[in-house]
């Protein structure tokens, strides 16, 4: 898939106020400072579509971007940032939960994980929540240019082992990416394109919204 247009639509903290367009949505979420904004800019070919920051926890709202006029990329706040107040964490958790559990247009979530680190408890717990809530998701491992292929394979194997230990029958589909070197971009966009084709083929509600 080629990205021809990418347009910021709206930011808000209430899932009920998200765009009414019945278009497929792909939500991106991960721990703070995982490289989410850089990844979004990389796959959309827009350097400043999502604002990048060295400060973890910068994204604090649900951000909708309309891509090619027929699907939404949704940028969600990061989880697990210790310096955010308990009250703010609670607010984040509530509207993220509301979005995931009530947003009919959500087709797939992408959970971003920094591949430089070994399996993190908070990522395993978040993916367990997604699985228990029956929310379809894939994993995107970021910053693959920062470590060797051997370490990448080792860290992915560690995540697979942890997920099996948490009663997963299999590991969700995953993508290995690097925003600085555009690694994984084509694979990720091809996946979204294939899912979109299935969505439009099997759901007239989505098709009629284009």
UniProtKB/Swiss-Prot annotation:
Ligand binding (GTP):
30-37, 57-61, 75-78, 142-145, 177-179
Name the Gene Ontology biological process terms: division septum assembly
What's the family?
Answer: Belongs to the TRAFAC class TrmE-Era-EngA-EngB-Septin-like GTPase superfamily. EngB GTPase family.
Q: Specify the EngB-type G domain's residue ranges.
A: 22-198
Instruction: Report the protein's function.
Output: Necessary for normal cell division and for the maintenance of normal septation.
Q: Which Pfam families does the record associate with it?
A: MMR_HSR1
Kindly list the positions annotated as binding Mg(2+). 37, 59
Alphabetized InterPro entries for the sequence:
G_ENGB_dom, GTP-bd, GTP-bd_ribosome_bio_YsxC, P-loop_NTPase
**What's the protein called, per UniProt?**
Probable GTP-binding protein EngB
Lineage, top-rank taxon, reads Bacteria
User: What are the required cofactors?
Assistant: Mg(2+)
PROSITE patterns given in the database record? G_ENGB (PS51706)
What are the protein's UniProt keywords?
A: Cell cycle, Cell division, GTP-binding, Magnesium, Metal-binding, Nucleotide-binding, Septation
Task: Report the GO molecular function annotations.
Answer: GTP binding; metal ion binding
